[in-house]
Amino acid sequence: MKEMIIWPAYIDLKRTKNEGRKVPKEFAVQNPKLKDIAGKLKKMGLEYSIEHKKSYPKDPWEICGYIKVKADKRTSKLQILKEICKNMG
């Protein structure tokens, strides 16, 4: 297993790639929330923990939190992000 960090900015439609979005626009969602991301991870059967009082490094003034996910070593972060985005928004 490996751990990875998922910030809401990674799947946020209003962000550009330079601002931190990691998925293509066609997968991105409007205003992703930690609870929605956590709900998708739970449905996917992945183990996770939520860190609420953390700020995204590119926006240090905005406290948005992140999710730490435990995933199989063969699963990429992009695969997980795309799966989270399905049927969201």
UniProtKB/Swiss-Prot annotation:
The alphabetical list of record keywords is: Cytoplasm, Ribonucleoprotein, RNA-binding, Signal recognition particle
Decide whether keyword Repeat is in the record. Answer: no
What the entry lists under PANTHER family is as follows: SIGNAL RECOGNITION PARTICLE 19 KD PROTEIN, SIGNAL RECOGNITION PARTICLE 19 KDA PROTEIN
Q: Which family does it belong to?
A: Belongs to the SRP19 family.
Q: How does it assemble?
A: Part of the signal recognition particle protein translocation system, which is composed of SRP and FtsY. Archaeal SRP consists of a 7S RNA molecule of 300 nucleotides and two protein subunits: SRP54 and SRP19.
Which first-to-last residue range defines the signal peptide? none
Taking the first listed entry, what is the main subcellular location of this protein, grouped into a coarse class? cytoplasm
Name the gene for this chain.
srp19
Intracellular or extracellular location(s): Cytoplasm
Q: Does the keyword Cytoplasm apply?
A: yes
| Superkingdom | Archaea
Q: What task does this protein carry out? A: Involved in targeting and insertion of nascent membrane proteins into the cytoplasmic membrane. Binds directly to 7S RNA and mediates binding of the 54 kDa subunit of the SRP.
List, in alphabetical order, the GO biological process terms annotated in this UniProt record: SRP-dependent cotranslational protein targeting to membrane, signal sequence recognition
Lineage runs: Archaea, Methanobacteriati, Methanobacteriota, Methanomada group, Methanococci
Protein's UniProt name: Signal recognition particle 19 kDa protein
Q: Could you state one GO cellular component term attached to this entry?
A: signal recognition particle
Which HAMAP family does the record match to this protein?
SRP19
Q: Which Pfam families match?
A: SRP19
UniProt-recorded Gene Ontology molecular function terms: 7S RNA binding
